[in-house]
């Protein structure tokens, strides 16, 4: 417990994290005799050397009007400085909290979540073929070419999948933010896939638990698992190259 609390509350003032990823992990937890789906908010960062770190493991503050705002304020209280880029899905409460808490930071809408949002408006039998079409948008070498590909898709499918096209149009620009950071690995900063892979691994490990008896046990076990990954990452090769991080900090300065 002491190690878990120390990890979750450690100061962040001695490290700069230019890039953050934010996501939530849901598990079944027993609360007041009921079984509920409870979220833990996880924030990953890449430091100036390009190494990954886990900087927040926080249960969703359901009683708060802005649980993400509470999370970000806690990070700032621990010494986190405003990052250059934050990657997440487009949950409205999350996006507004990012804008309010970190003015000046760029926000990248996770392209994988965005594709799922778009495909939700496409008939099941046509999802696979349409997914292969829209995926090409974010593989374009430049933002201008990505926009052109997106507009071509909109023109071609406006009548066939009007709601999907509207979704694409509404969220397109936020999904192209990563092009403003050309020195960084586009595959890694255009989505939160890294967190999703980790979440799948954690779910595999928590499946033996089934239902957590309370929130404290949930937070404790999640943090313990994540601490193990943080240790591994600290001695593994950089996730983003140090040169690309330094170049990004210079450009954004």
Where are the model-predicted features located?
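Acidic/histidine-rich catalytic cores and adjacent linkers
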Residues: 136-253
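A short, charged helix-loop
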Residues: 60, 118, 129-133, 137, ...
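Conserved beta-strand -> loop -> alpha-helix junction used to position metal-binding or nucleic-acid-contacting
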Residues: 85-92, 97-133
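Amphipathic alpha-helical transducer elements in NTP-driven molecular machines
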Residues: 19, 37, 62-69, 88-95, ...
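Secondary-structure boundary/capping positions in well-ordered alpha/beta enzyme cores
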Residues: 82, 105-106, 164, 175
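RNase H-like nuclease fold core
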Residues: 1-87, 92, 96, 101-104, ...
